[in-house]
Amino acid sequence: MEDKTNTAWKILGFYLLIILFVLIAGSTSAQVVVTHYNAGWNNVNDVKWLKKLEDCDITKVDIVKKPKQQKKHKIVVVPTIIIFKDGEEVKRFQADISFSIKATREELQDVINEQLMSDF
């Protein structure tokens, strides 16, 4: 009976170790943040595919509601998408005169992947 108890505890400990590893690995990989700056009056030009980006956190900022963010990040045209790594800007995509972004999901994903791979 004691052998079965020890084996059960070892298995449980192994599973807990795996869960802990997954949690730690998941929390360290969220170093890349993609922030989409836009304004309520320009919602027609929201970047709809942004949520399909992988291995990053995605945030949206309405510059009308958060003018301090607009000033801090020097947003002069909307939409603007900025990719941050560890809080530092690494790439910026800005709208053209039509207030729409020409960058593709693939272009942004490439930048995200490059940033993640630069850690290795």
What role is predicted for each listed range?
Residues 73-83:
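Structural micro-motif
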Residues 85-120:
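Non-catalytic, surface beta->alpha helical segment in thiol-disulfide oxidoreductase systems
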